Amino acid sequence: MNPLVFAASVIAAGLAVGLASIGPGVGQGTAAGQAVEGIARQPEAEGKIRGTLLLSLAFMEALTIYGLVVALALLFANPFV
């Protein structure tokens, strides 16, 4: 294997995981903060807000998992070799 291709694949894998986690991380923090604020304003709607929050967090976390899958594909099933 060409060492330059291997080094580029490792750097790309790191960038894939890093960049794929920035957006969902910010989004999850914002969503959780807004959910806490909403529960503080309307405590009787806690169940509905919590359910919606958990579903939203799962969808946001899926984006990070896609970045991890791309990184693992670059590291272990490298198409550039």
Swiss-Prot record:
Keyword Lipid biosynthesis: no
Location in or out of the cell: Plastid, Chloroplast thylakoid membrane
SUPFAM superfamilies membership: F1F0 ATP synthase subunit C
Major localization class: plastid
GO MF annotation: an example: lipid binding
Superkingdom, natural source: Eukaryota
Membrane topology: Multi-pass membrane protein
Site (Reversibly protonated during proton transport): 61
Gene3D superfamilies associated with the record: F1F0 ATP synthase subunit C
Role noted for this protein: F(1)F(0) ATP synthase produces ATP from ADP in the presence of a proton or sodium gradient. F-type ATPases consist of two structural domains, F(1) containing the extramembraneous catalytic core and F(0) containing the membrane proton channel, linked together by a central stalk and a peripheral stalk. During catalysis, ATP synthesis in the catalytic domain of F(1) is coupled via a rotary mechanism of the central stalk subunits to proton translocation.
Membership in a protein family: Belongs to the ATPase C chain family.
Quaternary assembly: F-type ATPases have 2 components, F(1) - the catalytic core - and F(0) - the membrane proton channel. F(1) has five subunits: alpha(3), beta(3), gamma(1), delta(1), epsilon(1). F(0) has four main subunits: a(1), b(1), b'(1) and c(10-14). The alpha and beta chains form an alternating ring which encloses part of the gamma chain. F(1) is attached to F(0) by a central stalk formed by the gamma and epsilon chains, while a peripheral stalk is formed by the delta, b and b' chains.
Protein name: ATP synthase subunit c, chloroplastic
